[in-house]
């Protein structure tokens, strides 16, 4: 019997999210790799949930980070209420989109935690 790849497919340019230990990685879908049930994404931001409210705290701008190919099953659709505040933070006129060493390390740690 042949295993069928996952049927999870996201639309190109759609914003998706991976949730892990109260941290959220938001990314833009570049393409679906259906043969291996993976998703090619462009990281946008890393955020953390606030236990006292439903709001997310913006942590790192990841727009200049390396693109990722990860299992599609890790992702979920990002909610408008999550994305809109982050987008306004990312594209604020006074904000530079420089990938800092701390942001790069945070992304690396987040991805490493997924595979532990």
Residues of each region from the PLM?
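Intrinsically disordered, low-complexity, charged/polar segments
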Residues: 47-116
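A broadly conserved detector of short glycine/acidic/proline-rich loop/turn motifs that flank catalytic sites
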Residues: 22, 45
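Membrane-targeting and insertion segments and their boundary/processing signals
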Residues: 1-4, 77
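Short, solvent-exposed secondary-structure boundary/capping segments
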Residues: 36-44
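Short beta-strand-centered aromatic/proline hotspots
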Residues: 23-34
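Short coil-to-beta transition motif at edge beta-strands of beta-rich domains
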Residues: 3-21
